[in-house]
């Protein structure tokens, strides 16, 4: 049981670090804006004054200009990636408990909704909601595991000896019913 809690904690911390890194990248794009500094490989004083003392114009930018992606599209793309990661986390947690799966799925949807606002604040809200949700999922998962370890494996009402809560559910069946939001908005 300790190993499961430890693994869940490592997964949750890794996901939060990833979310905070993405939010930091996004906030840098929003706050700094585009910076266009040409670089020719020569020091500035040699570029301005030629070898014989004549004045030469600055060299044009040799980099190929890439079309800039609007901030809202970048935010939508990052939100979609985060949603898919949380959904994958929900499916992994769902191997242990249906309630934990539903809670993690709700966390993923809330995170997507908050991140869809295309603001740094939205990402911060999503990160905080994901952190709280993952801690809650971890606690529920720990409670489910402790309940399973203390209960008997044979239920009086079941004909084959499995309790209703111990019936295995295939992750493919569960994933088929999860709606994926429309990211084109």
Swiss-Prot record:
InterPro entries: Gra2_protein (IPR008118). Keywords: Glycoprotein, Signal. Residues 43-66 have a biased composition (Basic and acidic residues). It is found in: Parasitophorous vacuole. The keyword Metal-binding does not apply. Residues 41-75, 142-185 are annotated as: Disordered. Residues 1-23 form the signal peptide. May also be O-glycosylated. The N-terminus is blocked. The keyword Glycoprotein applies. One of its GO terms (cellular component) is symbiont-containing vacuole. Glycans are attached at residue 18. Major granular component involved in excreted-secreted antigen (ESA) immunity. Possibly acts in conjunction with GRA1. This is Dense granule protein 2. It comes from Toxoplasma gondii. The lineage of its organism: Eukaryota, Sar, Alveolata, Apicomplexa, Conoidasida. The gene is GRA2.
């Amino acid at each position: 049981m300790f190993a499961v809690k430890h693994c869940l904690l490592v997964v949750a911390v890794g996901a939060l670090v990833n979310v905070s890194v993405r939010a930091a990248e996004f906030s840098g794009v929003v706050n700094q804006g585009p910076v266009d500094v040409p670089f020719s490989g020569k020091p500035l004083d040699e570029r301005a004054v030629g070898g014989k003392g004549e004045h030469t114009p600055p060299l044009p930018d040799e980099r190929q200009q890439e079309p800039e992606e609007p901030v809202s599209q970048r935010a939508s793309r990052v939100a979609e990636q985060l949603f898919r990661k949380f959904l994958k986390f929900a499916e992994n947690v769902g191997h242990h408990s249906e309630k934990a799966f539903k809670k993690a799925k709700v966390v993923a949807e809330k995170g997507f909704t908050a991140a869809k606002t295309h603001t740094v604040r939205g990402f911060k809200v999503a990160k905080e909601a994901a952190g709280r949700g993952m801690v809650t999922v971890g606690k529920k998962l720990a409670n489910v595991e402790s309940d399973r370890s203390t209960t008997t494996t044979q239920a009086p009402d079941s004909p084959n000896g499995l309790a209703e809560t111990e019936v295995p559910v295939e992750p493919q069946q569960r994933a088929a019913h999860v709606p994926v939001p429309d990211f084109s908005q």
